UniProtKB/Swiss-Prot annotation:
One of the record's GO molecular function terms: proline-tRNA ligase activity
Its biological purpose: Catalyzes the attachment of proline to tRNA(Pro) in a two-step reaction: proline is first activated by ATP to form Pro-AMP and then transferred to the acceptor end of tRNA(Pro).
GO biological process, one term: prolyl-tRNA aminoacylation
Protein name: Proline--tRNA ligase
Top-tier EC class: ligase
HAMAP family given in the database record: Pro_tRNA_synth_type3 (MF_01571)
Subunit field text: Homodimer.
Location in the cell: Cytoplasm
Length: 462
């Protein structure tokens, strides 16, 4: 396997392949095949997202993949932001369609005509829905598994509210939801408000959740958008107020994609392979029997016990592989915890525990497994989080001059917010403005022009 520090790009590509996450050999560029193991991980990530949003009164929906040109063109600024990325369906069978249909690049234009039918009065608000679907964008840049592709596994939440203040409260709620998701995935991040020229098409403002890969490049892993009434006026989404007058709703959205998996691979993995947070590991505990009389039955009994307390456990009883090969194989797949059992453990009624990311082994009594295994999985998660934060912090650099921008990572510097100063930084350092950092409200002089500025983040991005 490639060395992660020396050649991150090749290491990443290799680990995606050998861990059976995805196969990029499908004969359409940027449309990769999810392998079973990768899809299981992604579905577990989806479940974390569902659990996080469901507790905040969101309902899941599923909209059609096709959007008519007319529906898209209702909001001109929105389609202008995507027009070069849209896949168009122009024929049905052999017949040319009267109106072209788009494969959804995102779902505002699909959902909001329906919102205008669903929302009638203040009693229908807030409206809070989400879906997890494929979206399609004609990506012309270099594609990379889970990072930049043409068919994207996508979560999108859409809301409608009575007032701007209620929509702002929803924006705050998104940050609470996101923090819960990021904690489960052990992902460090910064909140950045995107510059005006980089906000989502049609939004009043956009806040992004940015992390940094070991290569030093930033990776956007989530966004939230305040729409105000920009979309509701165009799609005629209004409600009857208690005083008998009509008002346009205020809207927000929240989006994430399989980039979450890309971040997990890149940030947590090592030269042995994946390191998976327990919450998203398809197999949380693998039991490797060392051949001996009665050992396999002992292993199966342990599997039954752990499955019974909600641990995803699997006995590797493959006959044609040695225990050593199995250890390496499951380490490569990122399984958080390994249990080794042989004749000695059977005789002593013990097991040997080996965590994926913690050195050494631990012998515990069989009867204490139901306590020891959950505790060990908690320790695995804590160590993943600790290591990720350590790497993240090492790649966040405070700059006092443009010379400091030569360093890799997320560069923190004061900036006035002007496009002119941003362009100068990008032209001289190849690092663009991600936006103002919302984790810190410090102020200072712009690193370029010397005018009053706020703390901003700059980086080369994926």
């Amino acid at each position: 396997m490639e060395n992660k520090k020396e050649n991150f790009s090749e290491w990443y590509n290799e680990i995606v392949t050998i861990s059976d996450l995805s196969d990029k050999r499908y004969p359409i560029k940027g449309m990769n095949v999810w392998r079973p193991y990768g899809w299981k991980i992604m579905k577990l990530i989806d479940n974390i997202i569902r659990n996080a949003v469901d507790k905040h009164s969101f309902d899941e929906v599923n909209f059609p993949v096709l959007i008519s040109r007319g529906m898209l063109e209702v909001e001109f600024e929105h389609i202008r932001g995507f027009e070069n990325e849209i896949y168009w369906v122009t024929k049905g069978g052999k017949e040319k369609l009267e109106e072209e249909l788009a494969l959804r690049p995102t779902s505002e234009s699909a959902m909001y005509p329906m919102f205008s039918l669903w929302v009638r009065s203040h009693a229908d608000l807030p409206l809070k829905i989400y879906q997890i679907v494929s979206v399609y964008r004609y990506e012309t840049k270099h594609t990379r598994s889970f990072i930049r592709i043409r068919e994207i596994h996508f979560f999108e939440a859409h809301t409608a509210h009575e007032s701007y203040e209620d929509a702002e409260k929803q924006m705050d709620e998104y940050r609470i939801i996101w923090t819960e998701i990021a904690d489960a995935l052990c992902l460090p991040f910064l909140y950045d408000q995107r510059p005006e020229w980089d906000k989502f098409p049609g939004a009043m403002y956009t806040i992004a959740f940015d992390t940094v890969m070991p290569s030093g490049r930033s990776l956007q892993i989530g966004t939230i958008h305040q729409y105000g009434t920009n979309f509701s006026k165009n799609y005629d989404i209004k409600y009857l107020k208690e005083d008998g007058t009509f008002e346009y709703v205020h809207q927000t959205t929240f989006g994430m994609s399989e980039r979450l998996l890309a971040a997990i691979i890149g940030i947590h993995g090592d030269d042995k392979g994946l390191i998976l947070p327990p919450a998203i590991a398809p197999i949380q505990v693998v039991i490797v029997p060392i051949p001996g009389e009665g050992v396999e039955r002992y292993a199966k009994d342990i599997e039954t016990t752990l499955n019974g307390i909600g641990i995803r456990c699997h006995v590797d009883n493959r006959d044609n592989y040695t225990p050593g090969y199995k250890y390496n194989d499951w380490e490569m797949r990122g399984v958080p915890l390994r249990i080794e059992v042989g004749e000695r453990e059977l005789k002593e009624k013990t097991v040997t525990l080996a965590a994926r990311n913690i050195r050494g082994k631990k012998t515990v009594q069989r009867e204490k497994l139901v306590y020891e295994v959950p505790d060990m999985l908690d320790l695995v998660k804590e160590k993943i989080t600790e290591d990720a934060k350590k790497t993240f912090n090492s790649l966040v650099v405070s700059a006092s001059s443009l010379d400091d921008f030569k360093k890799e990572g997320l560069i923190k510097a004061f900036w006035c917010g002007s496009k002119e100063c941003s362009d100068k930084i990008e032209n001289e350092t190849e690092k663009s403005a991600l936006g103002f950092n919302l984790n810190n409200d410090e102020t200072g002089k712009c690193i370029v022009c010397g005018k009053a500025g706020k703390l901003a983040i700059f980086s080369r991005s994926y």
